[in-house]
Amino acid sequence: MNVYVQRDDVGLGQIHRFRIFVQSGGNLHSATSSTTVPPTVNLNSVTKKESGSIEDRAGSGGMTISSGENISKQISENNSSTNPKHANSESSPLLSSDFSSSSKDYHKVGAFTDNTNAINIPEQTRGVSHTSSSPSVGTSFSSINLREVKNPLAGSDSTAPFINSTNSVLWIRVRNREARFRQAAYLQGPFTLCVSVWNDQFFDEKNSLLNFDPQVQPSTSFWVCVPYSCFSNQQPIYIEIASQAIFKDRSINFELAISQSQHSIRAMSAADIDTLHAFPALHVEHQTPENLWRLPYSSFHSKNSHLVVLTHGMHSNVGADMEYLKEKLIESSKSVKELVVVRGFTGNYCQTEKGVRWLGKRLGEWLLDITGWGSASFPRYSHISVVAHSLGGLVQTYAVGYVHAKTHGAFFQAIHPVFFVTLATPWLGVAGEHPSYIGKALSYGIIGKTGQDLSLTPLNHSIESRPFLVLMSDPSTPFFQAVSFFEKRILFANTTNDYIVPFGTSAMEVSSLGKVEEAEGSDKVMPTHMENGISPTLKENEQTVQSVGDNAKKIHASSEESGSSFSKALKSFVGLFSYSASKTTDTEIPLVKNEDENARKPTEPNCLGSDELDVSNSSNQFFCSAPKLDPTSTFSGVAQRVVNTFTNLFIPAVPTDSYFFKYHLHKVVVSDNVHDPAASFSTFDGITELNNMNNGFLSNEITIAKNWHRLAWRKVAVRLDGDAHNTMIVRRRFPNAYGWTVIKHLTEILFEQNTSTAYMNPISFDETTTAAWLSEIYEDNSISV
């Protein structure tokens, strides 16, 4: 029997990526891992999910894109090499289509139960020739931890020949081997995996292979059947396995199996082995988390190198959640022939509730360490840029100020600051976006010191009592000074579908605070957004300025209401986990604002792991979508936000199949303008005066916005579907694919020219003021690295 088996563990925030291909020609006894791999063409695929047994229970939620010619055929029951003998006699149709030159959209999406004996799969996969030898099988067992994503691809040796014919198939199974009871232990993990299988041509209608499932639960499996045309001629296939853990640093054990029959895969599941390489034709190249983030050798010997520091948000990580962003930054830098080193700090994982100061100081100390401060090798880089998501934007603001003050300005004189970028960062906190009882809950420490910072709670400090976000925005502080040193300051803000950090606070637009519901029904940005690079004047925005006072009244008034609506929201949230809530006929996948006649709506989706999935209708698409909120419900705006936030988190809306073929045509950037600081002061003066008439409810937010607007900012407003907050950084490559265009837009901004040669002028600063803040603000005994 040809077998490849591997068992391993992966850690919090890591990604393991695998690239596999099958050696072609001859009887394949002497296949080597050094064989070159040609481009992938004409790929087809089928995804199969299992349910029923604890050994092979299918993961909930998923997606398949497959394409090819004449692929709607049924496997004969006699072909035992491709259909397990123990399967029952019922059949599930393959969702597939024939292609022609005049057709528009040919791929379908589907999921399959394991209670089948005959499955419609591509014609190329039928009739695997009967031989006396056992079918080839490759199996990899591994364990994923909260920081890891694994892709299983490694070389192997064996003496058994590979069955090489046009009727051959390749089965791939990824199984979450954690105990079933851990499905309920969400706050201890969660112990779920995100699995993706794709090829180089996944975006081509006629040559696509793309299968993914963002929620492979413990004791469930994710199956993909790859026809011969997909792996012939040594065409590569990629497998990526990512941990979905958020709250705890937990290991998740998984198994990867590759074979020509499902029966062989199941037989190997019981084997008590860690690693077995007995599949000579199968070549596996494994990129470990360390390899993915390994520094280029050239960076140690270059005088001009650009360091890009990535900072994650709350309950997030750099290694897995920002891997896609890192990959695209490096790719884009090659177009301008610039040596870019992308790094991220991992020391704040699972500790993001400890406050901006605590997190920022640790990040600052790490930054000094990797740049060689205090050693003969300083500076190790010539330029530096910082890119952060969500809470990370505030953390990196503190970190650059900390570095600036501790080195008395020498750091940024030696390493030139270029780009300061934030993505969905709560610059104005979150108190102005929600009723006051939400702010009070945060101020009481419901999410630790970070919640107090975001609710603009006054500091308990012997010298400074202003809220910390107000303090950081003060022009006399090293934080403000350090941010001002950067050549370009860019912020990205979601106009819709971001209930965690809405547009008002992420764009530093006071007049937009608390207007999430209004933005949901409009394609336009809030009225204070700049047009043609110039902020509107007070006269032009009289109605907008008035809305600030009205908005303050509404937010303040909502705090007087009873908490009944919030309680109902929580009850609704609990209902999301019931079977009845998961099986709804009135569901809808959010589509990008583009008309597409080929985009279909799912029918009867079952997202939460039902034992049987209805796939009898070949036109069905299987998506994991969220139940729609009843528009007549009595929920308040904040209650709806709570439900929507958790719905997006637990049941993420994945892109439609047609999106992957036409994603480059979808426009998500609503506006992209440069803010002129000189044109905004009259507007802020009017807003301040009006706010004073309403008991100064938004006085802190106005102060923060006014201070930061002393600097020039490039503001990019985007409109994303699904979970916009995490989609903005493409937390997972395919489930969050709506954010691809945002990342592309960001990389085009950062690398429109070679920054190493474009920005060389030294900075200037007030050293006396900077040094004075060092001991007063962040050499606090309560802060330890």
Swiss-Prot record:
Report the transmembrane regions from the record. Answer: none
Q: Which Gene3D superfamilies match?
A: alpha/beta hydrolase
Return the EC number: 3.1.-.-
Q: Which GO terms describe its molecular function?
A: monoacylglycerol lipase activity
Q: Can you name this protein? A: Putative lipase C4A8.10
Question: InterPro entries per the record?
Answer: AB_hydrolase_fold (IPR029058), DUF676_lipase-like (IPR007751), Lipase-like (IPR044294), Rog1_fam (IPR016445)
Please give the superkingdom of this protein's source.
Eukaryota
Family of the protein in this entry: Belongs to the putative lipase ROG1 family.
What organism is the protein native to?
Schizosaccharomyces pombe (strain 972 / ATCC 24843) (Fission yeast)
